[in-house]
Amino acid sequence: MASNNNCAYELIEAEAQSWDYILSYLRPSCIKCAIQLGIPDILHKNADPIMSLSDLIAALPNLNPSKTTFIPILMRVLVDFGLFNYHQQQGDGYSLTTVGRLLVENHHFGNRSFFLFAQHPVVLNTAASVGDWLKDDLRTAFETADGKSHWDYCGADPEFNGVFNDAMAGDSRLMSNLLISDCCAGVFEGLTSLVDIGGGTGAVAMAIAGAFPSLKCIVLDLPHVIADRKGSGNLEFVAGSMFDKIPHANAILLKWILHNWDDEDCVKLLKKCKESISSRENGGKVIIIDMIMEDNYNNKQLVQSQHLMDLIMRITYASKERTEKEWEKLFLEAGFSGYKIITSLGLRSLIEIYP
């Protein structure tokens, strides 16, 4: 009898978990709806940290009056997700949580633009095509879904390219604040020149150039990314391919670049970097910001995010996230003499490698 009861409890638990998977598609849809309505921004700009439901509804632009009764239903779900706090004693009021603040437009540490990129139909189409991709002979699920590689698609579709660049710029704003903070103290000290490879719109390089006025910063990226961007002072933009020619500098920055490429291309790029930097005695180094895969983190959510990022890289770019041993192998194959993991930046780490 006890055994039957245990089986019943396990079945009930399993069913609850399966319903969580079944309904999980609604999570990003509800968050996207909140962003489209401007709810995080409205709560952020409100004079009082707690905003009543009636005031929130009144502040929503273009809301059909017949749909106002849906807003508390939406907010209840978003409270469940941890984006907002609910204050019943303050007249059904709401406030932003730390996670919710990350969805405020132009927030220094926000990931709003990255979220919107992840919800773009082209990206969702890739995820929906994994089953078909496993049966065909194409290199990535992105090609299965959209007929060309991610990079070729960016070059051919200005709208998608803009959404992608906005996502990278948003992430760069977050990373640039970390790079010039105490947690990365000393990384740029003593350098006279730096090339930010694949630096996009230049958010990271701008922050570094501003924090270190005597450091010349060069952003190297493809012509359709650089477009008509102009540098000033100690900041310069150069259009070109990192696999062709890299401007000479003390140091090179590779932020979230190497995980886009397979081992062979990574070694090729790292060799190019080694040719373009000063000797170790003269401060030469390559600064890498990328993920180090570990399964022994105490943070289960962090491990799960790393596993999902690894899956994304494989289906989108035919690349992968790497363990420390896999990183070390790449560095040695490219001819570098050593490396040092400087600090952890949440999901990613900062690594210095030396010629």
Curated annotation (Swiss-Prot):
The keyword Methyltransferase applies. It is an enzyme of class 2 (transferase). One of its GO terms (biological process) is flavonoid biosynthetic process. GO terms for molecular function: 3',4',5'-trimethylmyricetin 7-O-methyltransferase activity; 3-methylquercitin 7-O-methyltransferase activity; kaempferide 7-O-methyltransferase activity; kaempferol 4'-O-methyltransferase activity; myricetin 7-O-methyltransferase activity; protein dimerization activity; quercetin 7-O-methyltransferase activity; rhamnetin 4'-O-methyltransferase activity. Keywords: Methyltransferase, S-adenosyl-L-methionine, Transferase. Its EC number is 2.1.1.-, 2.1.1.82, 2.1.1.155. Pathway: Flavonoid metabolism. S-adenosyl-L-methionine binds at residue 221. Transmembrane segments: none annotated. Homodimer. Belongs to the class I-like SAM-binding methyltransferase superfamily. Cation-independent O-methyltransferase family. This is Myricetin 7/4'-O-methyltransferase 2. It comes from Solanum habrochaites. The lineage of its organism: Eukaryota, Viridiplantae, Streptophyta, Embryophyta, Tracheophyta. The gene is MOMT2.
